[in-house]
A protein has these predicted regions:
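Core catalytic lobe of class I
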Residues: 1-175
Length: 175
């Protein structure tokens, strides 16, 4: 039987050109409601810090530009972190994950509600060469550090880790 479901996500920026206003869509809240409606227990949320300067350079988001703070800071915003939302089904665990090899100092790092040390660039990047002009543009590789921690925390050696949205295969690569 399964144990936990870990969902990597972020809240979604709303663009004025597409929807007529600038804001955020509570995507993490939508995920939470969907899992609770399906009978899962919301167990935890990890916030993954991302550099707002890198986000501003990559997205040119108006709310992150310094000139916007100087012009009208009511339209400014903070950077958008990633989240890992953890859900589980209630019931007996026939094969508990004991983590006897996890030292206290590493557990304290993993137990932090904000993971500040995830290397945002540590991803599988080979997909870029395979892109075609007609390909979908939503490829978003997950950081390998995040996957490594979640596998360590929530699975035993030899367990099958189900990854329904395999994308470029980062979870399989880390497992």
């Amino acid at each position: 039987s399964g144990r936990n479901v870990c969902v990597h996500c972020m809240d979604l920026p709303i663009q004025k050109g597409k929807e007529g206003f600038i804001g955020l869509r509570d995507f993490s809240g939508m995920i939470l409601r969907a899992f609770e409606d399906a009978g899962f227990i919301y167990a935890s949320r990890i916030t993954i810090w991302k550099d707002p300067v890198v986000e501003m350079q990559r997205t040119k988001a108006l709310g992150l530009l310094h000139k916007q703070v100087k012009k009208d800071s009511t339209m400014s915003r903070v950077g958008i972190p990633d989240y890992v939302m953890i859900f589980r089904k209630d019931g007996e665990r026939n094969n508990p994950v004991t983590n006897t090899d996890l030292p206290v100092d590493l557990w304290q790092k993993y137990a932090s509600p904000v993971w500040m040390d995830i290397d945002y660039g540590n991803t599988l990047q080979g997909f870029r060469n395979g892109r075609d002009d007609n390909d979908e543009k939503h490829i978003c590789p997950l950081q390998l550090d995040t996957i490594e921690r979640l596998i360590h925390l929530y699975s035993n050696k030899g367990d099958t880790v189900f990854t329904p949205f395999m994308g470029i295969g980062s979870e399989v690569f880390q497992a």
